[in-house]
């Protein structure tokens, strides 16, 4: 087999492969012999058909099959021989395909980039330091109580924070419009759910009252037919209800699965969850900075095939997440290209760090991560056992741990500054990383 390789760009290779006619004929004959054993030809017993008849009837098909299989087999033999690492399937162009002659074809494909990850000392990391204070737990209890607010009917004028049950009919220039009317709508005043001016105009109403209000749709309203127009809404108030925060008692604690320990036990459980959230938030922000730093220090050209594959994965995820009667390939590729490129580049960089530093998943950390995830469930021991019985889930956890070890490796070499902040600042969502 003869092989020659031409570099047509930084990552594209044009490989010419020549396959001797003897190898072709061996493969063709092998297939004809297999066919002869099972072929049914009128006038002959199975397995007794003369080879001349077999050739006449089946040689063309056997040759096409043999050539296709040989191209696939010799391509992989050639890339191994040439020490190439294809990043996707090749585009194959036959050059010589005649019977009785050598097969020659050209395979064009991209290869994975070869590079070394550098610039660790140029990466600046701000690592947040925070604790869960008693006041943070108090604030969380207030949030949990507000999330479980109940509304009770009152015989007074409505205030911000009250919940109204209303019917309304909206018109513009005396004409009703789509979506402008509803019955039995629950509306919390001050929630910002309705267009500006709607909720403010209902402050002070009482149950049974009818009121006409005239709010204006914003100029940037999504329905362009309504944008910037003033509407008239005839509103009937069916009821006014005031918010009632639940008491911190056993009934409230039971909503969160806490059946014993009283307030002290509930606070301890809330604190434990907050501490877990804090650790995860700090870890996530450090990881984002590490990845951004690796990207900035290591500009890597990536194969278009890998970006295309990642774009397709993101399309499928988008359809699964948002639903709708749409096929993934109907979503414009450009919507996902920047995110896809970032993922591909980071995947290559992380894999190279693993290779450079000979990293392997720390099984103790794998166990620790599984136990931490399991602690959020009612029966953590069962969750841990489930992970260890599921190879796919275990591999995913090991991948997460290996990525954490990459982050730790970078932190040992980067410029790290610790910064003390409040719990609230530490758990604020990090800004989305910029796509490179």
Swiss-Prot record:
Reaction equations catalysed: [protein]-peptidylproline (omega=180) = [protein]-peptidylproline (omega=0)
GO terms of biological process kind: 'de novo' cotranslational protein folding; cell division; chaperone-mediated protein folding; protein transport; protein unfolding
Enzyme class, broadest EC rank: isomerase
Listed GO MF terms: peptidyl-prolyl cis-trans isomerase activity; protein folding chaperone; ribosome binding
Domain PPIase FKBP-type positions: 161-246
A GO CC term attached to the entry: cytoplasm
Subcellular location: Cytoplasm
EC number: 5.2.1.8
Keyword vocabulary terms for this entry: Cell cycle, Cell division, Chaperone, Cytoplasm, Isomerase, Rotamase
Domain-level remarks: Consists of 3 domains; the N-terminus binds the ribosome, the middle domain has PPIase activity, while the C-terminus has intrinsic chaperone activity on its own.
Family assignment from sequence similarity: Belongs to the FKBP-type PPIase family. Tig subfamily.
Protein name stated in the entry: Trigger factor
Organism field: Ectopseudomonas mendocina (strain ymp)
Gene behind this protein: tig
């Amino acid at each position: 087999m003869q092989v020659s390789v031409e570099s047509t760009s930084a990552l594209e290779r044009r490989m010419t492969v020549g396959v001797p006619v003897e190898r072709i004929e061996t493969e063709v004959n092998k297939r004809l012999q297999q066919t002869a054993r099972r072929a049914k030809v009128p006038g002959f017993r199975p397995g007794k058909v003369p080879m001349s008849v077999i050739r006449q009837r089946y040689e063309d098909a056997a040759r096409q099959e043999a050539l296709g299989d040989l191209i696939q087999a010799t391509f992989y033999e050639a890339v191994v021989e040439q020490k190439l690492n294809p990043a996707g399937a090749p585009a194959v162009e036959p050059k010589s395909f005649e019977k009785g002659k050598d097969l020659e074809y050209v395979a064009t494909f991209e290869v994975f980039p070869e590079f070394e990850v550098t610039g660790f000392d140029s990466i600046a990391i701000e690592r947040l330091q925070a604790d869960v204070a008693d006041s943070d737990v108090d604030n969380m209890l207030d949030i949990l109580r507000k999330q479980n607010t109940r509304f009770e009917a009152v015989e007074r004028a409505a205030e911000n924070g009250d919940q109204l049950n209303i019917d309304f009919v909206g018109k513009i220039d005396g004409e009703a419009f789509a979506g402008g009317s509803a019955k039995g709508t629950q509306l919390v005043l001050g929630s910002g759910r309705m267009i500006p001016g709607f909720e403010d105009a209902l402050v002070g109403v009482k149950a049974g009252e009818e009121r006409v209000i005239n709010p204006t749709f914003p100029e940037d309203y999504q329905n362009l037919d309504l944008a910037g127009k003033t509407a008239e809404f005839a509103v009937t108030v069916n009821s006014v209800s005031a918010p009632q925060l639940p008491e911190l008692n056993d009934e409230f604690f039971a909503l969160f699965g806490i059946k014993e320990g009283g307030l002290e036990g509930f606070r301890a459980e809330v604190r434990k969850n907050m501490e877990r959230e804090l650790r995860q938030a700090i870890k996530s922000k450090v990881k984002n900075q590490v990845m951004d730093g690796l990207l900035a220090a290591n500009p890597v050209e990536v194969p278009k095939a890998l970006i295309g594959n990642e774009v397709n994965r993101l399309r499928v995820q988008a359809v699964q997440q948002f639903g709708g009667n749409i096929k993934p390939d109907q979503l414009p590729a450009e919507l996902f290209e920047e995110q896809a490129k970032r993922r591909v580049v980071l995947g290559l960089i992380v894999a190279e760090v693993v290779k450079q530093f000979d990293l392997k998943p720390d099984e103790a950390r794998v166990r620790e991560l599984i136990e931490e995830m399991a602690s959020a469930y009612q029966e953590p021991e069962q969750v841990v056992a489930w992970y260890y019985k599921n190879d796919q889930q275990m591999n995913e956890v090991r991948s997460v741990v290996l990525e954490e070890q990459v982050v730790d490796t970078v932190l040992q070499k980067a410029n790290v500054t610790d910064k003390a902040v409040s719990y609230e600042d530490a758990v604020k969502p990090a800004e989305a990383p910029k796509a490179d």
